[in-house]
Amino acid sequence: MKKPLQPTPEAVLEFAVATIETYFRIEALTRSIGGFAQAGGEWGVMKTLIYQGPHTVPDIARSRPVSRQHCQTIVNHLYEKGFVEFIENPRHKRSVLVQVSKKGRKHFDEMTALFLRAARDYAHHFNADDIETATTTLRHAREVLVI
């Protein structure tokens, strides 16, 4: 069996540019659907907390390509809305854990339903295999591109 051809640097750059362009369109869409500027970031932080359990702000930031300060801004905004709460961290006295509140879980589920409705509106433009391949490729790129 032949080894797949390695892409050219130009092709990898084009992939990166297309990813960035798509990201900004998706971000604009999530803002319009979520009704607030940080819709995607807030949803992403809550998703991390729901699926992985309580985290410190630095831990959340390390799992995403954002600064701790940016992540703290998102968490503070979620806290002001009552979507997350701070709990004692048995491993560290000064770095509290963040967890999603009941109100936050309800909000997350509502946002997810809105995002899924939008995804349904666009799904007919794609082939299922292409979406699966693109998702696999992007996840692989995320693992390879370590800063």
Where are each of the predicted segments found?
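C-terminal regulatory/oligomerization modules of transcriptional regulators
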Residues: M1-A11, A128-I147
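Short, hydrophobic-biased segments on the C-terminal half of alpha helices
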Residues: V57, V75-N76
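N-terminal leader segment of winged-helix/HTH proteins
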Residues: M1-A37
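Charged, amphipathic alpha-helical coiled-coil/dimerization segments
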Residues: H77-T136
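N-terminal positioning helix adjacent to the helix-turn-helix/winged-helix DNA-binding module
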Residues: A11, T22, G41-E42, K103, ...
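Alpha-helical linker/hinge and terminal dimerization helices associated
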Residues: T19-T30, R64, H107-A123, A141-L145
